[in-house]
Amino acid sequence: MIRHLIYSSQKRAIWFSLLVFVGLLFTLGCEANANIEDSSTVIPTVQSSAANVTVTSTLVPSPTVNRTSSCIPDGEFNSDTDYFPDKANVNYANGFSLEYHNSFKILTINATDSTADQSFVLVQCGAPIPDTIFPTITIPIESVFLSSTTQYPSFIELGSVAKIKGIGQAAFISSKEIIDHVKTNEVVEFAANFEVGTEVVIESNPDVLMSNGFSDPAYTKLAQLNIPVINWMDWQETSALGRAEWMLVTSSLLNQELTSRVFINTIAKNYEEITEIAAQARSDVVALAGSAFQGTFYAPGGASYVANLLKDANIEYVWSQTPDTGSLYLDLESVIAEGVTADIWINAPTQWTTIEEGLSEDPRYGELESVKQSNVWTHTLLVNEQGADDYFERAASRPDLLLADLVKIAHPDLMNEHKFEWYQQLPNK
């Protein structure tokens, strides 16, 4: 009986202790939760150099997509929030890089033989401007001046043609959408005579000016006046896919990385599939490429994107062993000597409409085997009424179609269903 009472007392004591322990845990848990709730409403203050930015003091859900047409609302900025959930990796291009931070990106245009490194801080609208020595650009941009025709396609693809407020030369535009935009809106032509009109640019004060990549004192002057001038160096890429990837420079300014990433991935997939088809060719084809202007024959260097396009098309290029990424400057005697046995000639002078016309310009072209076999090609299939060639506008952004054209020229049996996009064979007369 005593043993039973002792056992019962011990049992009650144990249960009582357990109840006290559980109650203590519950109390501590409630206090911890209360502390967590308190901390969630207090976000560290972010020092801002922008007077119109207010730091939030309440928890705001993180964005699931980039802001392509709006700013961070006043009072909702949070330094811990990633405002760029849609990012882009640079997989093919060598000429630029993108670095992402929570509320800003760093766009770097790499140095070339003629230009220095450039870095720009792209700050999400509504976010504070970070302390930096680099020029800052508020994104998404609302206005842009474009110097090169290869810059147009990305704005078309990203649905942002309306942001184009200035163009270099209207005469070189081939896209109907851009032509219509220029005609119906107050779009400034700022380099009609191949000279940048700085006063016109300054008056318009665009968010960004994209240069043509060539050195010009006018660009330096504009940059000194706080108009960001981005060097557009796509033409120095060594691969066609690398050149197409310059679309990411545009999309980073528009916060449209998601759209550009899908577009580029699709093109890259197409390109790889066409390369695999070209590899099945059973015959060796040698190509001469380039054209003469004022006594000098300009040919793609052996490390250029054109030379690598020919390689991917399973075409042997006459000057493939040269290390140049740009153009070769040759005399016609060298061209005849080295290219005399080439099977095809691509990128022949665009002003020629017949082979006969070319021979009248210089009879020595008649020594070339490609001329004898009437296998001379120009990229003039899509030239509009004002003489603008779509090849110089859209081909850089669609290397898959460009590669398909080249494969069809050299290995027509492998691309029966492909219709030429830019190239056409010159008739004899």
Feature names for model-found ranges:
Residues 105-204, 208-213:
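A short, structured surface patch at a secondary-structure boundary
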Residues 26-29:
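C-terminal motif of bacterial Sec signal peptides marking the signal peptidase cleavage site
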Residues 11-22:
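Sec-dependent N-terminal signal peptides
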Residues 1-11:
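N-terminal secretory signal peptides that target proteins for export/translocation
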Residues 31-152, 259-288, 355, 409, ...:
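Bacterial Sec-exported substrate-binding components of ABC uptake systems
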Residues 326-341, 345-413:
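C-terminal soluble interaction/assembly domains
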Residues 276-362:
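Flexible, glycine-rich surface segments
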Residues 186, 197-199, 203-296, 320-321, ...:
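Extracytoplasmic substrate-binding proteins
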